[in-house]
Amino acid sequence: MRYQITSDSTCDLSPELLQRYNIRLLPLYVNMDGKTLRDGLDVRPDDIYAHVSAGGGLPKTAAVNLADYVRMFTELSAQNDFVIHICISLDFSCCYQNARLAAADFDNVYVVDSRNLSTGHGLVVLEAERMARAGMAPDEIVAALQELTGRVEASFILDRLDYMKMGGRCSAVTLLGANLLKLRPCIEVKDGKMGVGKKYRGSFEKCLVQYITDKIGARSDLELRRVFITHSGLPEETVQKAVETVQKLQPFDEICVTRAGCTVSSHCGPGTIGVLYIRKAEA
């Protein structure tokens, strides 16, 4: 059967992975300086950082609109036996509602809420492609993905909280305390929502190693097919330290290093990195 897996740009999959697995993306929008820009096409995270550093304020992100979805589904549904679109969590954006509305006019278009963001969302996209390539029927894929979303573990550790403060996600007092005490909070996605997990103290590299160890060390319940290390713009040596730490702790078949897109970057700012993976299904 001919199929097409599609997603929103918030999945943060690299161009190489998109090409390898023939994933089609629709960009979210970033409103900056009175202009509406397409995530990953007209604007990139470094543009946002430069804009904020210049005193321009934090840009706002906006969902893929209904017309964009209708246009893509019209094209792809005619070319394929089925299309499966995976969205960023309903709790982060109205992409899912818009995609569902657009898909209602097509018998062979299916929409799935990833219940995640960034490469937590991306992991669901790649699993959808793997299932479709294996010959599963679209109804079976959708059911399998809905079960899978509860097993994706996505988290990030932040080196700085100024972007969280600008976005109204932490207070000035919290920011001051974190800076004084050298606290690096872990942001976790649970049940489709973002929350604060453990707080680490010390140098960023020390906290990074401890964070990764806490997440994947001494565990036998992880699917080892793939892990993502996703960051919002960090020095190569810091990213490599994360890779080496993961390699020491778990024998993943594939370690994918990716840059976070505009959504995560505008929420968390530079100096953010996470490990994202899937738990095994319970027996």
Where are the regions that the model predicts?
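Mixed-charge interfacial surface used for oligomerization/domain docking
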Residues: 4, 10-24, 28-31, 82, ...
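N-terminal glycine-rich anion-binding loop in soluble enzyme alpha/beta folds
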Residues: 4-65
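Glycine-rich phosphate- or other oxyanion-binding loops that anchor nucleotides, phosphorylated ligands
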Residues: 55-57, 63-90, 97-98, 142, ...
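Short beta->alpha junction loops
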Residues: 63, 114-115
